[in-house]
């Protein structure tokens, strides 16, 4: 409150103010238990967050023995069922066992560490998978991503057929500049024609098949297909690395993560490439599913048809059946019989009118009787054949 207002308006008694503040949240809770109070929940969440997070798959990189992370993960999963989460240790639990020399408290703490690491690892993997699904679903729903992925795949196919082309090499450098991250994707694109980049070509083929070609699939089905492809590729290359059917779960998860991040980077790159499109591409549908033309669209189409050039239709052969042949041009009223008897005497003239139309005129060299019975000079009779707009 402003000091001026504080002087003008008397404050209530301090006792009443303290009672009102202390009873406010209690009335809102409706007499609920203290455990569900907002302040108690905030304190509890802060205490839980104070426990350092541990990830069995990614902590202490390069310091664990091969296969030990897999054993820790499976041990935490098995101990989680029978591990008491709210057990209180007393002084008797710290006594050493005469059989193995390990106290119950020590075993409980070690199992608690394994269970906690397992739970944190599962939570991190679930969050990463959920984030990946949301990102992929958002990206493949954009039309720019579909167009950009189609262009990227088509360019890669053309570059593999002709890797020495200077024009394609210039386009390759332009595409690489759109990569936002410095990493494996940029290096593999620069060496896309080399054998070590074959994995990227396979991934592009799969994404192009799922996102571009399979137009009948829903967005959720495309996300599921992409996840299936990622898992299949991860298992294939993981077995190649270890040369065995058994692959530690942590290594398989890391290879899977690599492919998932690469998929997101390719879709983001496709989005950047598809933004250059200026015209909207409409999907071709059958005539039975097309919406009928309204009056405004019908009049617009009619105006285009009236103002279009008819010569293009004649030259295209659409109305070639309606055009009479040269032999029939002379048959008709007003034309001499010489047009049929002497077809070599026919001549044609094309004239362009001031209004832009074209007129075709026929010149007929007819025969007229001379005064002395001979043939006179060839006379010309004109007949306008038609106007084409």
Swiss-Prot record:
Region Disordered, annotated ranges: 350-389
Gene coding for it: L1
GO cellular component, as recorded: host cell nucleus
Quaternary assembly: Part of the genome packaging complex composed of packaging proteins 1, 2 and 3; this complex specifically binds to the packaging sequence on the left end of viral genomic DNA and performs packaging of the viral genome. Interacts with hexon-linking protein IIIa; this interaction is required to promote correct genome packaging.
Compositionally biased region (Basic and acidic residues): 362-374
Induction behaviour: Expressed in the early phase and late phase of the viral replicative cycle.
Protein name: Packaging protein 3
Region ranges (Interaction with packaging protein 1): 1-131
Keywords for the protein's UniProt record, in alphabetical order: Host nucleus, Late protein, Phosphoprotein, Viral genome packaging, Viral release from host cell
Intracellular or extracellular location(s): Host nucleus
PTM: Cleaved at different sites by the viral protease during virion maturation.
